[in-house]
Amino acid sequence: MDLGISEKVAPLLERVRSFINEQVMPVEHEFVAEIEVDDPFVLTDRQTEILGSLKNQAREAGLWNFFLTGEKGSGLNTVEYAYLAEEMGKSRLAAEVFNCSAPDTGNMEVLHKYGSEAQKKQWLEPLLAGEIRSCFGMTEPAVASSDATNICTSATLEGDEWVINGEKHWTSGAGDPRCKVMICMVKTDPEAPKHLQQSQILVPMDTPGVNIVRPLKVFNMLDAPHGHMRVKLENVRVPKDNIILGPGRGFEISQGRLGPGRIHHCMRSIGSAEKALELLCERATEREAFGRPLYKLGGNIDIIADARMNIEQARLLTLKTAWMMDHTSPKEARIWISMIKTVVPNMALKVIDDAIQMHGGIGVSQDTPLAEMWSGQRTLRLADGPDAVHRMVVGRNEIKQYLAEAGEVAATFRDG
């Protein structure tokens, strides 16, 4: 099992790291400072200029669409891409600059893997080119979304059209004017078996009946310009051919989508933790109290050591999960994905929280990125499945294995 940086990805990783440090980081603060109070989800002229210039430079340098692994994508495997995702996690803008930001990556993977040729032509091509953005409508306000089969939004076939009614919330990116299409999880057959009731349908955002109700704040922050929207769909009519893969395949598609996405999220989280540790060390060495640098006070050196050890453990677990995704079945990888989805956000939260504490009051202000980083990681404990559900998956699997092995041992003694 080789989890190291391969010869293929090593030079690419260095180029990505250099691009982020030399091109992205110097303008990131300016981009954030430009967010408009009156209309935070619309990019200002200066933000458009910054982002457009960075994306053009990245595309011309071949630093583009890394996430689409395998022969038809970047040629990277999941382990190799994981190292790039970690670097992107150190910057607020980097993932979008390289056209590797959620939810577009997951949507592009869905269209690449399951979409028809017409769907790929209409939506995948402009997404891969970075010309448009997209959103994914799954979570709903009226039901517990920790159960991925728990969908109320309905789609009824009337002639050659699907008629969609329902509400979605936490629809990330839906308020961005660049967002042109939603992949919407709907219920098409309430009488079918539980995992065959759902379908996924492409809904252009300018379709009559698609209404942005309001943005949802995260710890009273809008998370602009990306944002998370509540969306109402009232008698939304789209062509029959907008369904992806076919009726009843929605749950199957969502599982294929969420697995790689969770690995990407976790590696970016490790990048965030690395950035927080860097800021923590900077503060601990430059700031003095009682005549001594902070790292020489109390148990602060232990905090720094624990952060490094916890990051390394989480990285190794995530890389092994990426390896499982490359070399085993999705069913086998599923348990490992649940492990990292539980371990990594909680690890990152602890490191970021320790960095906040080391900074004192300024750590919770807008003068450092730490408060926003903490908010993002706390949200990730809920996004793509709450960690309580992932713990349940891991625990149940452990009991299942124990009982199977215990049964084999008992049978051996009984028969022997």
Where are these regions (language model features)?
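A short, Trp-centered hydrophobic/proline-enriched beta-strand micro-motif
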Residues: G130-T139, I183
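A short core secondary-structure module
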Residues: D160-E161, N165-V213
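Short, surface-exposed charged micro-motifs
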Residues: C152-S154
